[in-house]
């Protein structure tokens, strides 16, 4: 990870970014090969294409509900001195073991149960990973470091993915079944995730924290109760979270359900996977560009640009019927995906108390990190009610419009120092 210009990453910042490289491989698997694995099991179980898309969406929503309950609780406990790293390790362990175990499922229902466990572990780890940003860098460097995290996550995750894709597409030529190839792909992804996590575990130290008290867990519940009661008083945080809930729900729905959407439309599997690989490649320089732009323009100006672009993406997806259109969609998503994620993370990190970063990022996670609730429900319900996947995905434009308006409101409530 060579740096250009005057900006130089510290060793700790590089190790923090490296975790993004690891967990992003799992994200890419969830967006590409895991839905194909589930589709094969669903077909053998007699599910229709519409039922397949609907169940995938409902499971994604279930993950978000579980994570929404656990994240603020665990995040608040993790703010206590010495707690953040152990809980982070636990979540990573659950995610990695779940990733390995998915390959053992022989029916669609057990597969979904294991997937929920793995995704909850993954989503939980992101609460603590994101909250570490205030410990690994300074406020003036957050936009750039956060953007580089997403950028290297996108391009770094392509390394195991290309190998996994080669295994799946070339399974017959090397004498193994496609299901065996998918099992190997899951194991490879888990190994990559583990190896890229170790440097952060070795170097990270919790700098901002709440001192250890008697009955730490009970006190953590008291702190989060106090924060929730008084959250509306901090208007810059309150209105941002409302806006973030809407627009990031749409973003993560597109990420999580892209392959399932294309499959439901009957598009070629190989073309879909290669198009999503292009998304990762395009997202790498795009995220870096947004990081550089953040040195010149405040995130309050850049985030609305990304939201507006996603509204256009939802409209385009409504009319999508052919594979070449999916390729265009993949490129456009790649241009703005990293920017909206990275800038939202760093924007939030700068407006919250650093010693309560775990607690606040638990709330941040509820609003859509890892998997989306409202967005996936909109897509699933819309698809089932109309019999058209296009209508379901196109309906996401509502989330982006509302998110755009609420974000502008949040910026007017109080100027956020950049």
Language model: regions and residue ranges:
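Glycine-rich segments within core transmembrane alpha-helices of 12-TM secondary carriers
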Residues: 146-168, 365-375
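Helix-loop boundary and gating motifs at the non-cytosolic
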Residues: 6-64, 236-268, 272-275
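Multi-pass alpha-helical transporter architecture, strongest
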Residues: 192-203, 394-418
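Helix-loop junctions at membrane interfaces in 12-TM secondary transporters
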Residues: 102-115, 318-330
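Juxtamembrane intracellular "pre-TM" segments in multi-pass secondary transporters
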Residues: 2-13, 205-242
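A membrane-interface helix-boundary motif in multi-pass transporters
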Residues: 49-50, 168-191, 381-400
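Helix-to-loop junctions at the C-terminal end of transmembrane segments
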Residues: 69-83, 285-298, 383
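Structural signature of the two symmetry-related core transmembrane helices
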Residues: 86-101, 301-316
